Amino acid sequence: MAILRLENGTTYTQLADISLELAKLNVTLNYWPIENEATRQLLKQASLTDEEKEIVLTSLDGYFEQLKQEAGYQARDLIVLHPEIANLDTLLAKFERCHTHADDEVRYIIDGEGVFGFVFADGSQGELTIQPQEYINVPAHSEHWFHLTASKRVKAVRYFTSTAGWVPEYTETVIRFPSLTAV
């Protein structure tokens, strides 16, 4: 289950409490179960071939269809990150800085875990660890960052209305959250 840690030391582990805090940012967090047993078995593998990725994506297309109808999403892909990927730290570095996007950042974590950091309207910061079967929508222009946990493993479906709006626009905000340096 998701864990929200605020800069002031407060930690939330209940979805209702987390949702109340995230509502201040218009961030949406949902639980989307993975019911297909074959998909769950594929997700146990550290890496996936392109064919296996497509099998996983197809098995989860019910969620994609919902997003297409409700919000006009047009594309999705599956990103698989693990420690054996060459230059993983270099790849992740561009997301570990505070940035925004012109479009929503929508992720469905299906294996592993990742951490989204946020800057609240009052300037305070928080980090949300999201785990398998959790879906997050970070609204366009929300100041945030992303990093992996110490396991450095995640499989996430990324949803796009267009890929053009997903280019990071870096801000000068200093991340004060201590966990980024600990990873």
From Swiss-Prot:
Residue numbers binding Fe(2+): 99, 101, 105, 144
Catalytic activity: 1,2-dihydroxy-5-(methylsulfanyl)pent-1-en-3-one + O2 = 3-(methylsulfanyl)propanoate + CO + formate + 2 H(+); 1,2-dihydroxy-5-(methylsulfanyl)pent-1-en-3-one + O2 = 4-methylsulfanyl-2-oxobutanoate + formate + 2 H(+)
Site (Important to generate the dianion): 107
UniProt keyword terms in alphabetical order: Amino-acid biosynthesis, Dioxygenase, Iron, Metal-binding, Methionine biosynthesis, Nickel, Oxidoreductase
Disulfide bond residue pairs: none
Subunit structure: Monomer.
Name this protein carries in UniProt: Acireductone dioxygenase
UniProt source species: Microcystis aeruginosa (strain NIES-843 / IAM M-2473)
Record gene name: mtnD
